[in-house]
Design a protein with these regions (language model features):
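Poly-acidic low-complexity segments
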Residues: 2, 56-59, 91, 99
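Export/targeting segments at the very N-terminus of extracytoplasmic proteins
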Residues: 2-57
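Short secondary-structure capping micro-motifs at structural edges
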Residues: 33-36, 60-63, 92
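Catalytic and binding regions of secreted/periplasmic enzymes and modules that target cell-wall glycans
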Residues: 63-170
């Protein structure tokens, strides 16, 4: 029986490793900005949080007393994810693969709720105050050429103006 459990554990570990990814710092910054449309003014803070929470590893799991933290953003099983969903309506296992779309969606939700409660959504992450509340620009150093960042900011401004205009006409 113990041999079967050991084999099962090994096989499940290999499967997780096949679906997991460890990002490079700039790779994550570019993906958050370009694919997931992270706000430019928050990008360095998000990258800092990921570095200190998971070391850019999508399969990271941190064990806590009653629960555990999962994925890049180390999202808590107590409040946000669970086998049946929880507040982010997501299983914790789905936060441990190489597709960070659901991780980002949940992280944004956590940020928004904590922003409403505490005035700073980043305080939901324990690493924020000691590591990421000051100047975090070093986390983006060498990741973008200046024109691509300015182009993304301009696109964000144009999109925001378009959304405001659409809301006025609705």
């Amino acid at each position: 029986m113990n041999k079967c459990i050991s084999v099962l554990y090994f096989v499940s570990s290999v499967v997780v490793l096949c679906w997991a990814k460890v990002y490079e710092r700039c790779e994550l910054a570019r993906e958050l900005l370009e694919k997931h449309h992270a706000p430019q003014n928050q990008l360095s803070t998000w990258v800092c949080i990921v570095e200190h929470e998971s070391q850019y590893n999508t399969s990271a799991v941190g064990r806590l007393g009653e629960g555990s933290d999962h994925g890049l953003f180390q999202i808590s099983s107590i409040y946000w994810c669970s086998p049946t969903g929880n507040s982010c309506d997501i299983s914790c296992d789905s936060l441990e693969d190489d597709d960070i779309t659901d991780d980002w969606r949940c992280a944004k939700r956590i940020y928004a709720e904590h922003n409403d409660l505490a005035g700073d959504g980043f305080t939901a992450w324990a690493v924020y105050r000691p590591h990421c509340s000051g100047n975090t620009e070093k986390y983006l150093k060498g990741c973008f050429n200046e024109s691509s960042v300015n182009e993304n900011e301009e696109n964000d401004i144009q999109l925001d103006l378009k959304n405001r205009a659409n809301r006025k006409h609705s």
